[in-house]
Amino acid sequence: ADIVNDVWALRQPGTAQVVARHPACGICLMHMHRDPQTMQSAPMEGDAVLQVLSFLKRAALDLQALGVNRQRIVLDYGIGFGKTVEQNFALLARQDELLAMGYPLLAGWSRKSSLGAVTGLDVDQRLIPSVTAALLAVERGAHVVRVHDVRETVQALAVWKAMRSEGL
């Protein structure tokens, strides 16, 4: 394996053993409020950014306490996993606060319902909103973006990078 994608961020039994069996791979820790069955029916309350920040910081430190080098850790703020539309957009707007922890950040906005909420588009029509969100996440410092439409996102990022390097 190249990466362990832990959507439970060490909250499931056996996770530490899986990580230990793969000492050369990266570990992505994602924030998910509650569990898949209840996360959307009872989303987070209050300042989601501060709660996600605290949760991910604790999970990353717990992983390091197990002997995992911090350079192997990537954090994912878990768009759509128990958060309201407003909270999801607040996480993007305040992504710099998450980056201040010093870990690479993954943003997974592709086809998310929050994009549908602001555009009115069905999931299979969210290409442009998804690419737009990926570009904004990268511009705001995300190191990795999780996408469905790889070719289109790569093309958009190439144009964005060229425009930034030329000062346009």
Give short role names for the model-derived ranges.
Residues 2-62, 66, 82-168:
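Active-site-adjacent loop and "lid" segments of alpha/beta metabolic enzymes
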